[in-house]
Design a protein with these regions (language model features):
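Bacterial N-terminal signal peptides that target proteins for export
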Residues: 2-12
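Bacterial N-terminal signal peptides
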Residues: 11-22
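A short, N-terminal "cap"/entry segment at the start of jelly-roll beta-barrel domains
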Residues: 25-69, 152
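Conserved short histidine dyad/triad with adjacent acidic residue
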Residues: 69-86, 121-123
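Glycine- and acidic-residue-biased ligand/ion/polar-headgroup-sensing regions
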Residues: 76-78, 86-105
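Short beta-strand His + acidic residue motifs that chelate non-heme Fe in jelly-roll/DSBH
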Residues: 81-83, 101-102, 120, 125-131
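Short acidic-glycine-tyrosine-enriched beta hairpin
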Residues: 106-123
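Ligand-binding loop in jelly-roll beta-barrel domains
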Residues: 122-146
Length: 152
């Protein structure tokens, strides 16, 4: 009896787990995020472009205009964004250069060399800076669409 109940529970659990990918696809799940096979993209194949906010961007996975995504972003050395927010929170990982991501009015920058990361809460004003003299490249990932909302 106990064995039969255990088998039934395992069968139900397996059916639920097997259904999750289909539900994600039906809900508009991201095919790159849950691809059927692995994907390899050398840095030489990244296609950088200027987005509508003027950022130099290459798409990682997903669609930054509509939902979950990752992007590579380039900033020239010694430059800073204006004070701005994003609707959705994100994580940033520094690939090249030295970045600082600070709240407005911060008294000093907290240098983030290559390999460092930061978390930016959605709706919180901040300034992103490339504080090295050389170009900065960082990888950003978010569960929501990308936007850049200048502070007023």
């Amino acid at each position: 009896m106990l064995f039969t109940k255990t088998i039934k529970r395992m069968t139900i659990a397996a059916a639920i787990v097997a259904t999750i990918p289909a539900l994600a696809a039906a809900a508009g799940g991201n095919p790159d995020l849950y691809a059927d096979s692995s994907k390899v993209v050398p840095v030489t194949e990244l296609k950088f472009y200027q987005d509508k906010e003027g950022l130099t961007v290459a798409n990682g996975w997903g669609d930054p205009a509509s939902g979950a995504h990752s992007n590579y972003i380039k900033m020239p050395g010694g430059t800073a964004s204006g004070v701005h927010t994003h609707t959705y929170s994100y994580y940033g990982v520094v690939i090249a250069g030295v970045v600082a991501n600070e709240l407005p009015g911060s008294k000093q920058d907290h240098p983030l060399p290559a390999g460092s990361y930061w978390y930016q809460k959605g709706g919180e004003q901040h300034v992103t800076k490339c504080i090295s003299q050389t170009e900065c490249i960082f990888f950003v990932t978010s569960k929501g669409a990308f936007d850049y909302l200048p502070a007023r």
